[in-house]
Amino acid sequence: MPGDASMIVIGAGSYGTALAITLARNGHEVLLWGHDPAHIQALEAVRCNQAFLPDVPFPPTLRLEASLPTALAASRDVLIVVPSHVFGSVLTELKPHLRQDARIVWATKGLEAETGRLLQEVAREVLGDQIPLAVLSGPTFARELAAGLPTAIALAATDATFSADLQRLLHCGKSFRVYSNPDLIGVQLGGAVKNVIAIGAGISDGIGFGANARTALITRGLAEMSRLGAAMGAEPGTFMGMAGLGDLVLTCTDNQSRNRRFGLLLGQGVGFEAVQETIGQVVEGYRNTKEVLALAGRYGVEMPITEQIYQVLYQNKNAHQAALTLLGRAQKDERAGG
C-alpha cells in the first residue's frame, strides 16, 4: 500500500543494503529494491545479503521489492545507492513512478561519467527544480555500518525540513551519528576526490614508499580537494569534516576501500585487467580520476597528484615514475596552489 514505508532504498549492493539495515534497525519500515529480480528473490529467501554482508541478518522491518512502481508508491522518500556512472539513467527510470510529493537523497559518491557534473546537477536536469534533494557522504564502510559499529556521516540537503527528517530517520544514538551541512557542493565533491587520492595512496603503499609518503599524499590530496572546492563555490570548512578529511583518511588507510586496494595492486605491478578482476566490484575512483581532472581544467585549478594518477590509469605511465615526478616538482610554499 502507498505510504506504508519510511524509506525506499534503490540499490541492493553492499552499501545500499547496509543503509537499509541501519534504517530498519532504527525501527522504520524500509523497502529495498534492486535491478535484478532474481537477486531480490535470493535476498528474501535467506534474509541477508550473502554476497556482501553474509553475517548480518535483515531486521523484520526491512522488506524486499522487485517491482519498481510498487516500491516507489510506498513512500515519498527515496534513497539512491548506485554507482555514479548509472546515476542519471537510474533517475530517468525512477521518474515516471515517483510520487508527486517525492524527495530524493543519494549516497552515491562520484561525478557523472564523461561530463564530470555533480550529481545534484544531474538530478535537477532529470527531475526538475522543485523536488527536494539531499546527499549523504562520509567515512562509511558498508560492513562496519551494517554490523552496527560506531559511524558518523555528513548530510547536505536543499530543504531544511527534508534535512531534519533524514537526520531523524538515520540517526541512532548507539551507533550512527548524522551531521547536517548546508554545503551540497562540498559534500558531493569530497566524496568524488577522495576516491582518486585513495588510489594514489594505494599505489604509494604498493610501491613500498611507507607511512611518511602515504601521509604526505593524503595531506596534499586534501589541499587539492580544498582548492577545487573553493573554485567551485564550496565552503572551506566542509573539507575538514566528515565528507572531506574524514572520508579521505578512511579510504586512504584501510584495505576495505576498493579504491585503495585497486591502487595497491597497481603499485605492486599487477596488470590492469587482473586488478579489475581481483577487485570484482565498481572502483569509483577509476572513472572519477578522469572526471576530477576535467573539472580541475575547467576551473583552472592545479591538481598534480590527480594528474599523475590519471597518467598511470589512462596513459600507462609507470607508477614509480609518477611518484618521482611528484617528488621532483619545483619547491614552493605549502600554502600555495599546486
Curated annotation (Swiss-Prot):
Binding, NADPH: 14-15, 35, 109, 142, 258, 282, 284
Molecular function terms, GO-annotated: glycerol-3-phosphate dehydrogenase [NAD(P)+] activity; NAD binding
Pathway: Membrane lipid metabolism; glycerophospholipid metabolism
Gene3D superfamilies: N-(1-d-carboxylethyl)-l-norvaline Dehydrogenase, domain 2, NAD(P)-binding Rossmann-like Domain
InterPro entries found in the cross-reference section: 6-PGluconate_DH-like_C_sf, 6PGD_dom2, G3P_DH_NAD-dep, G3P_DH_NAD-dep_C, G3P_DH_NAD-dep_N, NAD(P)-bd_dom_sf
Subcellular location: Cytoplasm
GO BP annotations, alphabetical order: carbohydrate metabolic process; glycerol-3-phosphate biosynthetic process; glycerol-3-phosphate catabolic process; glycerophospholipid biosynthetic process
NCBIfam families per UniProt: PRK00094.1-1, PRK00094.1-2, PRK00094.1-4
Function description: Catalyzes the reduction of the glycolytic intermediate dihydroxyacetone phosphate (DHAP) to sn-glycerol 3-phosphate (G3P), the key precursor for phospholipid synthesis.
Protein name in UniProt: Glycerol-3-phosphate dehydrogenase [NAD(P)+]
Originating species: Sodalis glossinidius (strain morsitans)
Gene name of the encoded protein: gpsA
